[in-house]
A protein has these predicted regions:
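Helicase-associated low-complexity/disordered flanking segments
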Residues: 1-41, 67, 292-327
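Walker A/P-loop NTP-binding motif
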Residues: 33-40, 52-67, 87, 153, ...
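Pre-Walker A (Motif I) flank of P-loop NTPase domains
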Residues: 37-43, 67-68, 108-109, 163-164, ...
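Conserved SF1/SF2 helicase motif Ia
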Residues: 44-47, 54-81, 160-162
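Conserved nucleic-acid-binding Ia/Ib motif block in the N-terminal RecA-like helicase ATPase lobe
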Residues: 67-123, 180, 190
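Conserved C-terminal RecA-like helicase domain
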Residues: 80, 87-96, 273-353
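SF2 helicase catalytic motif II
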Residues: 111, 115-117, 123-167
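Conserved interdomain linker/interface between the two RecA-like ATPase lobes of SF2 helicase motors
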Residues: 157, 164-166, 171-281, 331, ...
Length: 355
């Protein structure tokens, strides 16, 4: 992936920069310089800062050199999203997808897959590895996961020597140490760290008062220190036998966000069943967050996603309540959903139809 003069007017770097239509940040330039030198690179940057643009450039370089690029992600939802993005950029015929559920165009020059799929290909010495030039490891900090981290390590150790790795991570404290380890395993690996967060994070408490409807929202921090109003609430809760305040219902939080113009929102719940229960609670409490036009579009996307499932299958899977929730603008998303349902949720979310 090191053709001559990548920065020349007709070179891959110049063509790529023209195609994106905006000026790159310095950290993106540094990472792309490393790729132009044929080096692997570790990019550590906050969410929303544009680190995936570095991966997109590495993919473009591999294609320009007549090779293949594999884009790995830790979860199927990210694979599906990246598959759609790369297909829109390079053409659907040039992008494949390999997950536990789907095998679509595995011989394409760009293949998006979960990291476990690549590990299994390496174990099997698959011919799909022929001409592989670039591997993107998205969310590479999963390497530190006690349960799945060995998968990322095996991919790094077992991949052919000439493959360039572009490893993407959220901000980590030990990026330089991580980079030194990558260099020991893969050869020269440039570490590029960006600390500026372009999308500011704001943290809040949400509380409700017993016997009353509605939600009060308090900033978690004030002038960089814990909000004293929040600390007072906490102290009252500890002292009081009959607590005045309670955790708000999910529907109350959604109503607050809706009134404040803060939708769409994602609620993270660490249980599949609890995700489904939360969806039912919001819908059963009467929230309808979509317009007539949005509901019609949701219905169309849902019907196209489930068209291969029989009526009996749909009844067994609880299609009626699930699709009604989607039309209301609310949906669960987790690995327990059948692929057709999960695809419908992702398509609706990507179009801004889910709230």
């Amino acid at each position: 992936v090191t053709p001559a003069d990548p920065r020349s007017e007709d070179g891959p770097r110049a063509r790529f920069e023209r195609s994106i239509g905006f000026t790159l940040d310095p950290f993106q330039h540094r990472a792309m310089d490393a790729i132009d030198r044929g080096e692997s690179v570790l990019v550590s940057a906050p969410t929303g800062s544009g680190k995936t643009l570095v991966a997109d450039y590495a993919v473009a370089r591999a294609l320009d050199a007549g090779g293949k690029a594999f884009y790995t992600t830790p979860i199927k939802a990210l694979s599906n999203q990246k598959f759609a993005e790369l297909g829109a950029r390079y053409g659907a015929h040039r992008v494949g997808l390999l997950t536990g559920d789907i095998s679509h165009q595995p011989g394409a020059p760009i293949v998006v897959m979960t990291t476990e799929v690549l590990r299994n290909m390496l174990f099997a010495r698959s011919t799909l590895l022929d001409d592989l030039q670039v591997v993107i490891l998205d969310e590479v900090h999963y390497l530190q996961d006690p349960y799945r981290g060995s998968v990322w390590e095996e991919v790094l150790v077992l991949s052919p020597p000439g493959v360039v790795f572009v490893s993407l991570s959220a901000t980590v404290n030990n990026a330089k140490d991580f980079g030194r380890w990558l260099t020991s395993v893969r050869g020269t690996t440039r570490v590029v760290v960006e600390t500026h967060r372009p999308v500011t994070l704001h943290h809040h408490y949400a509380v409700a008062e017993r016997g009353r409807d509605g939600v009060a929202v308090l900033p978690l921090l004030r002038n960089g220190a814990p909000n004293p109003d929040g600390l007072k609430l906490d102290e009252r809760r500890k002292r009081s036998v009959h607590q005045r305040f309670r955790a708000p219902r999910r529907s109350e939080v959604v109503e607050y966000l809706h009134a404040a113009g803060m939708l769409p929102a994602i609620t993270f719940i660490f249980s599949r069943a609890a995700c489904d229960d939360a969806t039912r609670q919001v819908v059963d409490d009467g929230l309808r967050l979509t317009t007539d036009a949005e509901r019609a579009r949701i219905r169309s996307l849902v019907e196209s996603s489930v068209e291969r499932l029989s009526d009996d299958d749909l009844r067994t899977l609880g299609y009626g309540p699930w699709s009604a929730a989607l039309e209301a603008g609310v949906a669960p998303h987790h690995a327990g959903l059948v692929p057709a349902f999960r695809q419908a949720v992702e398509r609706c979310f990507s179009e801004g139809l889910l709230k």
